[in-house]
């Protein structure tokens, strides 16, 4: 599509220092009381080590610095008493519980095996279901809905803090849809279904794909029978607070690149996100630069990119970046690369894996014996051992401390000078990096406020 010099991407890389495990004490740096970073005593998977020590300069000079710059911040903590007095020399520990970035799986909330669902939930906290929210699966007749299975999924996701993307409002068409005589009737039915779903789930589902596979690709069962721009404008006006997007079979190769920001905004006024399948060509090993080139045009826009159907079919590797065959080792390497590279780009908000068992033979996270595959172990190493933050130390004379950490939800443990242990959770993001923990020793309570 276009070529960019490396200078477009390269900015000053943040120096990240990982300390070994020390006793609880403060570390003086830059005039601030810095907490010490703790390393997990677990060796990284070879695929993770291979990516972060790769001799591809684009990874070392662009991807990794972008990850440090875009997904981390200096997080400032202050510990005070209920009357506002700073609490000095409190022992402090903060550990990342969940990344702000949405790593997901299509079967996270629908997996039938309780064991496998537990294993999935230790990696992911987002789902774009493969089939459950398609129109044909909850509308047995015109104007008749059976949302019982979706309600159960939504309840499960709410209880387990799993975010949901609806796939998708305008299709696939139910069987009875073909009996409608005119395009006008079909258009009215698609609008009515969109309204029914949004009215029911606008407060419990995070993202809604309005259309899928009827722009870049044209699938008959996904065909939209009304003016797409007008339908989108109608839903945007009626549901102003809902996150609306579109989905299609866009990918990382030049033939399937995302449309321009200008095209998307003109076609879908008020759009919040675009969801790309990223599974064609079926055996493509895209380079990190090809991935960045796909994402980069959205960098300065408010439209986020969701990679919602990522998958590989085994066979001979396609593309020029790597050659050979897809096997356990190469799949582990590529999925780590895709996850880390998507995570590093500020335009991307979601990476959702597709089709665990069927067509996408390269996506299997569990073997025939039910045990986690090499791919699962590699993703577990990346998400739970590499992209994590765990720090410890003490507050200074101002009750303050600071650390560098990934954006997400943290569990904070504070032991006051009285020896009492207090725990709390708080969320850190780009615009929320200052947290104050207020401790009430008398009542034994603690709560966090974010500035």
Feature annotation, model-predicted:
Residues 115-124, 151-161, 197-202, 237, ...:
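Acidic (Asp/Glu)-rich catalytic clusters
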Residues 45-48, 200, 209, 214-220, ...:
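Aromatic-rich peripheral "rim/lid" segments of glycoside hydrolase catalytic domains that contact
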Residues 139-149, 176-262, 282-293, 321-334, ...:
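Active-site cleft segment of glycoside hydrolase catalytic domains centered on the general acid/base Glu
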Residues 43-45, 97-151, 156, 162-163, ...:
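N-terminal substrate-binding region of glycoside hydrolase catalytic domains
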Residues 124-132, 205-212, 246-248, 257-288, ...:
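Aromatic- and acid-rich polysaccharide-binding/catalytic face
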Residues 77, 127, 157, 208, ...:
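Conserved, mostly hydrophobic/aromatic
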Residues 15-26:
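Bacterial N-terminal signal peptides
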Residues 33-107, 135-138, 226, 244-245, ...:
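Beta-strand-rich domain onsets/edges
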């Amino acid at each position: 599509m276009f070529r960019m010099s490396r200078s477009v991407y390269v900015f000053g890389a943040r120096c990240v220092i990982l300390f070994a495990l020390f006793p609880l004490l403060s570390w003086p740096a830059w005039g601030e009381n810095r907490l010490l970073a703790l390393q997990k005593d677990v060796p990284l998977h070879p695929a993770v080590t291979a990516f972060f020590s790769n001799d591809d300069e684009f990874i070392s000079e662009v991807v990794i610095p972008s990850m440090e710059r875009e997904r981390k911040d200096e997080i400032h903590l202050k510990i005070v008493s209920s009357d506002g007095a700073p609490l000095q020399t409190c022992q402090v520990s903060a550990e990342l519980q969940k990344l702000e970035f949405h790593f997901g799986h299509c079967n996270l909330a629908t997996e039938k095996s309780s064991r496998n669902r537990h294993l999935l939930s230790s990696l992911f906290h987002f789902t774009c279901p493969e089939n459950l929210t398609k129109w044909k699966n909850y509308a047995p007749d015109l104007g008749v809905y059976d949302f019982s299975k979706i309600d159960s999924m939504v309840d499960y996701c709410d209880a387990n803090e799993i975010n949901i993307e609806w796939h998708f409002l305008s299709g696939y068409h139910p069987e009875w849809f073909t009996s409608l005589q005119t395009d006008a009737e079909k258009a009215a039915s698609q609008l009515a279904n969109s309204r029914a779903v949004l009215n029911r789930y606008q407060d419990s589902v995070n993202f809604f794909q309005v259309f899928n596979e009827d722009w870049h690709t044209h699938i008959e069962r996904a065909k939209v029978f009304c003016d797409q721009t007008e339908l989108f404008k109608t839903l945007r006006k009626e549901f102003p607070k809902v996150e609306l997007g579109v989905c299609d079979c866009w990918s990382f190769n030049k033939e399937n690149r995302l449309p321009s920001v200008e095209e998307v905004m003109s076609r879908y006024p008020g759009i919040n996100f675009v969801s790309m399948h990223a599974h064609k060509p079926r055996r493509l090993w895209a380079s990190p630069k090809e991935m960045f080139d796909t994402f980069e045009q959205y960098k300065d826009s408010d439209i986020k990119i969701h990679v919602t159907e990522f998958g590989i079919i085994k066979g001979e590797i396609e593309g020029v970046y790597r050659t050979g065959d897809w096997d356990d080792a190469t799949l582990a390497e590529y999925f780590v690369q895709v996850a880390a590279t998507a995570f590093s780009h500020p335009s991307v908000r979601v990476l959702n894996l597709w089709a665990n068992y069927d067509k996408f033979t390269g996506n299997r996270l569990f073997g025939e014996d039910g045990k986690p595959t090499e791919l699962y172990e590699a993703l577990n190493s990346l998400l739970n051992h590499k992209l994590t933050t765990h720090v410890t130390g003490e507050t200074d004379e101002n009750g303050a401390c600071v650390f560098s950490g990934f954006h997400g939800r943290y569990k904070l443990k504070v032991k006051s000078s009285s020896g009492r242990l207090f725990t709390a959770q708080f969320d850190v993001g780009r615009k929320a990096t200052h947290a104050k923990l207020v401790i009430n020793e008398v009542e034994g309570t603690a709560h966090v406020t974010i500035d």
